[in-house]
Design a protein with these regions (language model features):
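Short histidine-centered beta-strand/loop micro-motifs
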Residues: 58-60, 68-73, 90-93, 112-115
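Conserved hydrophobic/aromatic beta-strand scaffold that supports enzyme active sites
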Residues: 44-46, 57-59, 78, 100-102, ...
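Ligand-binding loop in jelly-roll beta-barrel domains
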Residues: 96, 105-136
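Glycine- and acidic-residue-biased ligand/ion/polar-headgroup-sensing regions
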Residues: 63-64, 73-90, 96
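Active-site region of the double-stranded beta-helix
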Residues: 46-53, 66, 72-76
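A short, N-terminal "cap"/entry segment at the start of jelly-roll beta-barrel domains
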Residues: 1-54, 139-142, 153-174
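Short acidic-glycine-tyrosine-enriched beta hairpin
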Residues: 51, 78, 89-110
Length: 174
């Protein structure tokens, strides 16, 4: 779940320990331990944490009917649908396997996996900058904030609780 108060953001690595080179991240959609709980019926699997832009890249898995709270992005977002059906309540389109989306910053929307999705949705999201969650879609006030640092901490906490090696996440920090 996103943070609701701020403190000094730090990726926890010693100076010089963060790799600057290119890399690959191998995901395993069948390994349930790697899925980090994010919201009711929604999980993420991390691919990259960009501490320069405070962005992050994740696989998002959502069960039919699951939704994320209304939010907007302070940077652009790119997404690619691998399986399942999903949409934003505020739009008429439905994303299906093969759908690519590009979101400019600043539009409030609510991600919903459609009730009639034939399987859980699996979406690759590349998020530049943070997300601002709102308490309601009409004239919403600030409810929570999410970015690469808070996503990293959420993943670290899950890895510790699941008995996974937290250092695996350090390799995803750029």
């Amino acid at each position: 779940m996103p943070i609701q108060s701020f403190n000094s953001a730090n990726d926890g690595l010693e100076s010089g320990a963060r790799s600057r080179g290119h890399f690959i991240a191998n995901t395993d959609v069948d390994n349930e331990k790697l899925w980090v709980p994010y919201a009711d019926g929604v999980w993420i699997q991390p691919c990259c944490f960009n501490v320069t832009s405070v962005g992050f890249s994740v696989l998002l898995k959502g069960l039919p009917g699951a939704q994320l709270g209304v939010h907007y992005h302070v940077g652009t977002v790119r997404g690619y649908t691998i399986q399942g059906h999903w949409r934003y309540l505020e739009h008429d389109w439905v994303a299906k396997p093969g759908t690519f989306i590009y979101e400019p910053a600043g539009e409030a929307h609510t991600l919903v996996v459609t009730d009639d999705s034939p399987e859980p949705a699996l979406i690759m999201f590349m998020v530049e900058g943070g997300l601002i969650y709102l308490d309601n879609p009409v004239d919403g006030e600030f409810a929570a904030y999410e970015d690469g640092f808070s996503a990293l901490e959420l993943c670290r906490s899950h890895y510790r609780d699941a008995g996974l090696d937290v250092k695996l996440l350090d390799a995803l920090i750029r």
